[in-house]
């Protein structure tokens, strides 16, 4: 049996661009991708904190250190520049793997610079 769990998360990233006339996807700063363990072309779920939208897309690698978080194609209609979003990737684990699994959580500031890395979240933890 397999269980789908959170693999990694970039928490409260700021949308820097929304490009409607692109094929599709989300462009993420390569530095953030590496810190979170998110790979190019990997499927991710995006949650918009500002408006509650939730959607899936795939990742394109952005310029390292740029802070770029750009929603492309149809997803560009679901965000505004400046919105705060959560980007999550999931993985399938066996029950044996599950008990040793720790997600990679990347907390960023308003410029999408890494401020903290973690492998857990506490209930009611507020990162504002």
UniProtKB/Swiss-Prot annotation:
Q: Which GO terms describe its biological process?
A: alanine biosynthetic process; pantothenate biosynthetic process
Q: Which cofactor does it need?
A: pyruvate
List the subcellular locations. Answer: Cytoplasm
Work out whether the entry's keyword set contains Cell inner membrane: no
What terms describe the molecular function in GO for this protein? aspartate 1-decarboxylase activity
**How is it modified post-translationally?**
Is synthesized initially as an inactive proenzyme, which is activated by self-cleavage at a specific serine bond to produce a beta-subunit with a hydroxyl group at its C-terminus and an alpha-subunit with a pyruvoyl group at its N-terminus.
Catalysed reactions listed for this entry: L-aspartate + H(+) = beta-alanine + CO2
Modified positions (Pyruvic acid (Ser)) are 25
- Indicate whether Plastid appears among the record's keywords: no
* SUPFAM superfamilies associated with the record: ADC-like
Q: What does the UniProt cofactor note say?
A: Binds 1 pyruvoyl group covalently per subunit.
Give me the residues that bind substrate, please. 57, 73-75
Q: For this UniProt record, give its keywords in alphabetical order, as a comma-separated list.
A: Autocatalytic cleavage, Cytoplasm, Decarboxylase, Lyase, Pantothenate biosynthesis, Pyruvate, Schiff base, Zymogen
Q: What is its main location?
A: cytoplasm
User: In the UniProt entry, which residues are flagged as the active site?
Assistant: 25 (schiff-base intermediate with substrate), 58 (proton donor)
Q: Where is the signal peptide?
A: none
**Known pathway:** Cofactor biosynthesis; (R)-pantothenate biosynthesis; beta-alanine from L-aspartate: step 1/1
Report the family membership.
Belongs to the PanD family.
Q: Per its UniProt record, what PANTHER family does this chain match?
A: ASPARTATE 1-DECARBOXYLASE
Q: How does it assemble?
A: Heterooctamer of four alpha and four beta subunits.
Query: What this chain does, per the record?
Result: Catalyzes the pyruvoyl-dependent decarboxylation of aspartate to produce beta-alanine.
HAMAP family (alphabetical): PanD
The entry's protein name is: Aspartate 1-decarboxylase
Task: Tell me what organism the protein belongs to.
Answer: Caldicellulosiruptor bescii (strain ATCC BAA-1888 / DSM 6725 / KCTC 15123 / Z-1320) (Anaerocellum thermophilum)
- Top-level taxonomy: Bacteria, Bacillati, Bacillota, Bacillota incertae sedis, Caldicellulosiruptorales
Gene for this chain: panD
